[in-house]
Amino acid sequence: MAEAKYEPRLKKEYVERIRKAMQEQFSYANEMMIPKLDKIVINMGVGEATADSKKPTVAAADLAAIAGQKPVITRARNSIAGFKVREQMPIGAKVTLRGARMYEFLDRLVNIALPRVRDFRGLNPKSFDGRGNFAMGIKEHIVFLEINYDKVDQMWGMDIIVCTTATTDDEARALLKEFSFPFRQ
């Protein structure tokens, strides 16, 4: 007997329900024109990296726990004396999620992490870039269940960019609404 291949819940929902809803709403001429999620980029900038060079490594470990994938340590491109930053100094971490990990992260973000954000009133519907990509920020990384609150010595914020194949912001907004993104009214 062949093993059933694992498929994330949101990907299954996209194939079965969301594609049909998008086709009805925008009436695309071709099935390949229906927008889909391309990738999710999570960036964690560590401002305290100038004082302690171990901070980006700790942030990268937390980001690896959240994303389920090893992040890349980002380095300064050039020196800025005002910020006490030298060229090639580690200043943060980032990770790009695609495929099954992307859908799993999106599921945890929308259903678990965002409701745990303090004073959360919804995502800003104007945070689209004009080409169908959505960017948001989270001030505390402890809203994710993968982070043990007792072991955290410092809280970091993170930028989350959801890249879609949509050509306009309206298409991307409709796609993300179908994925249950809680946009502000």
Swiss-Prot record:
Gene Ontology molecular function terms on file: rRNA binding; structural constituent of ribosome; tRNA binding
Keyword Nucleus: no
Complex and partners: Part of the 50S ribosomal subunit; part of the 5S rRNA/L5/L18/L25 subcomplex. Contacts the 5S rRNA and the P site tRNA. Forms a bridge to the 30S subunit in the 70S ribosome.
Family statement drawn from the similarity comment of this UniProt entry: Belongs to the universal ribosomal protein uL5 family.
The keyword RNA-binding appears for this protein: yes
One GO term of the biological process aspect: translation
Protein name: Large ribosomal subunit protein uL5
